[in-house]
Structure formats: structure tokens, C-alpha cells
């Protein structure tokens, strides 16, 4: 199997990526709380793929540091990558329609009618 190397590992362990905002967490603007909260259903889905032996990836449009912070807060072990199209990623879960992996799933966004844009503070 060492001759096959990476090909065997890719078949055996697919790469599955999860976005942070509105996928692994629900932003405070959608909950009415003063803080972001874990999205229990999507975290359970993450753990299911993890239990199957997949290579788990967490990424965010907010950057790698933001993704790393949330991975640590949520207790999720994953590879942290820049959020961009990546031929290595087999499956991607995101709240937006994306083309970042071989197969892309759009998860349900809570209270979609509420804008996710941050309000600009005027000083």
C-alpha cells in the first residue's frame, strides 16, 4: 500500500470542509443573543464524518485565524485552510451556494431574512 501512498489515503479518508459562520455557528444577529452560538445539528454532522475517519477541514471567509479560533472554542479537531476552491476537498458544507469542492452542500441558514452584514459604526 505504500506504493499507492496518497491515492490510497485519499480514497480511504475523504477531505470534508465546513464553513464557520451560519454553518458551525449561528451568529448573534440570527439568535437575538449577545453572542454567537454553536449550531448543534451541523456540529453533529461534522462529528459523524469525523467518526467515519474523514480528514476534517474548517475554513471561513473571515480568515484562517477566525476559523482556528472557532475550531478551538467548539472543541473540533480539523485542518484549518484558507477558504477557496481546492481540488483536495471532496465535500464542502456552507450556508451559501459555493463551488469550493468536488461536492458542495448548502446547509439551512437560521433566520435567513436577517441581514448578516455588520453595521458600520460612525465615530
Segments (PLM) and residue ranges:
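HAD-like aspartate-dependent phosphatase fold
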Residues: 1-123
Amino acid at each position: 500500500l505504500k506504493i499507492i501512498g496518497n491515492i490510497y489515503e485519499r480514497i480511504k479518508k475523504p477531505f470534508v470542509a465546513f464553513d464557520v459562520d451560519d454553518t458551525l455557528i449561528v451568529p448573534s444577529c440570527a439568535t437575538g443573543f449577545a453572542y454567537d452560538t454553536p449550531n448543534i445539528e451541523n456540529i453533529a454532522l461534522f462529528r459523524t464524518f469525523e467518526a467515519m475517519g474523514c480528514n476534517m477541514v474548517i475554513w471561513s471567509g473571515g480568515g484562517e485565524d477566525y476559523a482556528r479560533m472557532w475550531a478551538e472554542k467548539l472543541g473540533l479537531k480539523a485542518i484549518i485552510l484558507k477558504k477557496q476552491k481546492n481540488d483536495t476537498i471532496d465535500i464542502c458544507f456552507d450556508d451559501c451556494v459555493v463551488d469550493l469542492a468536488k461536492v458542495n452542500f448548502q446547509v439551512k441558514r437560521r433566520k435567513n431574512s436577517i441581514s448578516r452584514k455588520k453595521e458600520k459604526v460612525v465615530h
